[in-house]
Regions:
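Non-catalytic, solvent-exposed segments at the cell envelope interface
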Residues: 50, 54-58, 66, 92, ...
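Bacterial Sec signal peptide processing site at the extreme N-terminus
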Residues: 11-34
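Short, surface-exposed glycine/acidic/tryptophan-bearing loops
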Residues: 49, 70-79
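Bacterial N-terminal signal peptides
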Residues: 2-14
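Post-signal-peptide N-terminal segment of Sec-exported extracytoplasmic proteins
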Residues: 28-63
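A structured, mid-to-C-terminal "fold-capping" secondary-structure block
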Residues: 18-26, 136, 140-255
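Mid-length scaffold segments of soluble, non-membrane domains
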Residues: 76-159
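Active-site flanking loop/helix segments enriched in acidic
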Residues: 61-73
Length: 255
């Protein structure tokens, strides 16, 4: 964790360099908007040309017999590999209960769920995943949110969460315990699971990215409100994957 302090300090200093504004009832700190919009344009093109087609192929691997399809297996395996890192973060936050739940979920799915391809922990033992990350750990430690960022390929974030993504890679037990090739394979599987998520919520993601009057502002609004609610730091809960018609998507610039 030797990098945590300088990273967190950088977030604090950078987050104090601009004055947030109120937009649609929430505080928005976006001093890098022009650069963020350029990255957003790249991300939209990348999603349209690469991610969405892959997601559609993954989705096509499903079946109608109630059995898990390729999409479900990929999502399950990727989510299972993320659990050791969540255990570490819960412990760093001083929250032993979710750490224990995620540990047992990982143990059950790895042993009884064919290495995590299946989810007996959730379906048979009532052990749902308790989601967390190092961005939340920084929030628990009192590090401010910082400015809004859109990251290449990864999408919406903040300075605090961006720093958290870097540290999550550094502290993840999976990458320390596995051989280099196996660790890269695990990373690829987790990335593929994101394509599975994209397939599962494809219509709604398309409505936000392709049908919004201002998809950058719309995505920023959804992310900030959802993330702050998730961290109990204010903001109304918005499920970015809730079923909604394109006409119902909020345009934050609509008077």
């Amino acid at each position: 964790l030797s990098l945590v302090v300088p990273l967190a300090l950088g977030v604090i200093l950078a987050g104090c360099t601009s004055e947030p504004v109120m937009q649609d009832g929430i505080r928005v700190n976006d001093p890098f908007e022009s650069g963020n919009r350029r990255i957003h344009a790249f991300n939209k093109g990348f999603d349209q040309r690469v991610v969405a087609p892959v997601a559609r192929r993954v989705s096509a691997g499903g079946n109608e017999a109630g059995e898990p399809g390729a999409m479900d297996l990929v999502i399950n395996a990727g989510a299972n590999l993320s659990l050791p890192g969540k255990v570490v973060n819960s412990l760093l936050q001083g929250r032993p209960e979710p750490a224990i739940r995620n540990f047992f979920r990982f143990a059950v799915n790895t042993t009884l769920g064919m290495g995590g391809l299946l989810d007996p922990a959730g379906t048979d033992f009532g052990l749902p995943e308790v989601d967390t990350d190092f961005g939340e750990t920084l929030a628990v430690w009192g590090v401010p949110e910082g400015a809004y960022l859109e990251l290449p390929v990864l999408g919406p974030s903040t300075q605090r969460d961006a720093a958290g993504k870097v540290v999550d890679l550094l502290i993840d037990p999976v990458y320390h315990l596995l051989h280099r090739d196996a660790a890269w394979a695990a990373f690829g599987l987790r990335a593929a699971s994101k394509a599975g998520d994209r397939a599962r919520f494809g219509d709604t993601v398309d409505s936000v990215l392709q049908d919004s009057a201002d998809s950058y502002a719309q995505l920023r609004l959804i992310y900030l409100m959802h993330r702050r609610h998730e961290l109990n730091q204010g903001g109304t809960e918005i499920d970015p994957y809730a079923d909604a018609a394109a006409d119902d998507v909020i345009d934050p610039y609509d008077p």
